[in-house]
Amino acid sequence: MCGRFELKTKFEKLPKVLKQDYPSGLDSKYETQNLIRPNDPVLVIKNEGRIKTTFMTWGFISPWAKDPFSKERPRPFNARSETVEEKKLFSASWKHKRCLIPASGFFEKKYRVRKANYETFWLGGIWSKWTSPDGVELESCCVLTTEPNDLIKPLHPVSYTHLTLPTTLVV
């Protein structure tokens, strides 16, 4: 499971698609992130009629949540690609709200996994928009995971049944 990742890419080296339609001030306030944890803000590309760069909370909040910050209902930060379409929590986002999350590495147990050339890659994800009774909107996302490939399997003991690999994409 991908529970930590990093984005150590400097702003000028980020993929061009991230810099086409981004939040005001991102270029001057952007900082690399050495350790991104669930509930942290993450940089995301989404498509709602046009490709847009934005920040979202990493940890999926359902649109029908009464309290998005409740400690009683943890927010999933991963969704298994094999079952995401079947899960009520994720099915609408799977159909209509997919996203890409830039990363330069992710962590599995005590290992850091990155590209050999240190380039940015993409984690596939889904996102959701929660709206408060007052009309305040909060966007959140989670990373899609899949069965681990032969490079990642050795990073966990055989008894570890939850092992999944973030869905990485080449764009």
Whereabouts are the PLM-identified features?
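Short, His- and charge-rich active-site/binding loops that engage polyanionic ligands
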Residues: 3-98
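Residues immediately flanking
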Residues: 103-106, 146-148, 165
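Conserved small/polar residues in nucleotide/adenosyl-binding loops
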Residues: 161-167
